[in-house]
C-alpha cells in the first residue's frame, strides 16, 4: 500500500470531493494536491488498474515519483501469477525514479531474491525495508541490504541470515536504528550468533525485536553491552533466556519498553502458532474469498503499454 502505516486503504466510494461552489464538474478537475492526496491512500494495484484510467490528469499525477516514495506490496491477492507479482513490483520501483524511501514486500508466496536486488540497485536512499518470506536466501538478503547505506529500519520475518552476512549488514548500514527479526521455531536451538553480530556491529540501535530467537543469556548480555542506546527490546518467545537476578534488573531498569520471553503476542498478527507446532499464515477475508485462477487484471501476464 502506498501510504503510511497509519493510513487505511481508501475505497472508491470514499474518495473525497470538494463541497459547495468549489465542487468540480468532473474528476478531471480535481486540484493536483487533492488528487495526490487521494492516490497516496490507494494501493499500487488500485492506482495501476483503476485510478490512472480515470482520465489524463489522473494518469499524469500517478506517474509522479512522489506518489511512489512508500510502497507496500504485502497484499497482491489479485496477482495469482508469480511473474505478474514480480512485474508489478519492478514497475512501481521504476515509477519511484530512485526516490523510494520505504519498501514492504510479502515474499511468502513467491521468490524475491532478484526483486530485492532490483529494488536496492535503484533505491539507494531507502530508509525502511520489510521482507516477509521463508525461501529467500541469506545471500539474497545480504546482497540487497548492503546497497542501502541509509537504511534506518529493517524488518525480516521468517528469513534466515548467516552470521557473517549479519555482521556485514551492520557495518554497511551505520544509520540502523530499528531491527526486527521474527523466526520460525529457532528458539528450540540455542544460538547466540544473531545476538553477537548485532552487539558487534549495531551500536546505534534504539529498537530491537527478536521474536522466536535462539539467543541465551550470553547473547542478551552482549546486546546490552554493545547497544547502549536501546530503548525498546522485545524478546518474546526467546525461551533459552533465563531472566533472574542482575540480568533481569538490568533489563527492567535500562530498557523503557521491555518484553519478556513469556509475554503474549497479542499485538502481533503476522503468524499463528497452532497447538501442534505448525505455522499457519494469517489470511484476510479478501484472500479467503478470492479465486487466484481468475484473469481480471492486466497484470495477469503483461504490463499495460500506456503506462
Curated annotation (Swiss-Prot):
Record-annotated F-box domain positions: 24-71
Entry annotated with the keyword Repeat: yes
Keywords: Leucine-rich repeat, Repeat
Residues forming coiled coils: none
Pfam families assigned to the protein according to its UniProt record, in alphabetical order: F-box-like, LRR_At5g56370
SMART domains in UniProt: FBOX
Ranges where the record places region Disordered: 1-26, 279-307
Compositional bias per record (Acidic residues), positions renumbered to this chain: 279-289
Chain positions of LRR repeats: 108-133, 158-183, 185-210, 212-237, 244-270
Flavoprotein among keywords: no
Name recorded for this polypeptide: Putative F-box/LRR-repeat protein 22
Lineage, uppermost ranks: Eukaryota, Viridiplantae, Streptophyta, Embryophyta, Tracheophyta
Gene designation per UniProt: FBL22
Amino acid at each position: 500500500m502506498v501510504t503510511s502505516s497509519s493510513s487505511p486503504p481508501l475505497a472508491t466510494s470514499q474518495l473525497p470531493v470538494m463541497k459547495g461552489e468549489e465542487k468540480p464538474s468532473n474528476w478531471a478537475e480535481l486540484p493536483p494536491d487533492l488528487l495526490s492526496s487521494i492516490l497516496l491512500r490507494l494501493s499500487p494495484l488500485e492506482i495501476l488498474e483503476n485510478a490512472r484510467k480515470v482520465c489524463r490528469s489522473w494518469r499524469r499525477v500517478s506517474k509522479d515519483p512522489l506518489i511512489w516514495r512508500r510502497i507496500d506490496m504485502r497484499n497482491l491477492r489479485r496477482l495469482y501469477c508469480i511473474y505478474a507479482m514480480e512485474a508489478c513490483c519492478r514497475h512501481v520501483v521504476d515509477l519511484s525514479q530512485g526516490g523510494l524511501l520505504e519498501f514492504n514486500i510479502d515474499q511468502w508466496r513467491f521468490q524475491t531474491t532478484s526483486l530485492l536486488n532490483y529494488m536496492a540497485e535503484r533505491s539507494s536512499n531507502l530508509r525502511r525495508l520489510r521482507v516477509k518470506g521463508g525461501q529467500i536466501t541469506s545471500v539474497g538478503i545480504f546482497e540487497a541490504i548492503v546497497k542501502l547505506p541509509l537504511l534506518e529500519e529493517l524488518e525480516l520475518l521468517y528469513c534466515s541470515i548467516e552470521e557473517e552476512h549479519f555482521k556485514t549488514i551492520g557495518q554497511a548500514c551505520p544509520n540502523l536504528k530499528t531491527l526486527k527479526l521474527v523466526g520460525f521455531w529457532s528458539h528450540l536451538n540455542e544460538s547466540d550468533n544473531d545476538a553477537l553480530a548485532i552487539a558487534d556491529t549495531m551500536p546505534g540501535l534504539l529498537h530491537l525485536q527478536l521474536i522466536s530467537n535462539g539467543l541465551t543469556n550470553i547473547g542478551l548480555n552482549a546486546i546490552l553491552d554493545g547497544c547502549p542506546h536501546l530503548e525498546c527490546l522485545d524478546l518474546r518467545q526467546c525461551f533459552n533466556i533465563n531472566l533472574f537476578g542482575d540480568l533481569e534488573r538490568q533489563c527492567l531498569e535500562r530498557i523503557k519498553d521491555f518484553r519478556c520471553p513469556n509475554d503474549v503476542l497479542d499485538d502481533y498478527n503476522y503468524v499463528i502458532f497452532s497447538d501442534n507446532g505448525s505455522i499457519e499464515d494469517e489470511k484476510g477475508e479478501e484472500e479467503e474469498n478470492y479465486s487466484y485462477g481468475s484473469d481480471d487484471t492486466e497484470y495477469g501476464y503483461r504490463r499495460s503499454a500506456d503506462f
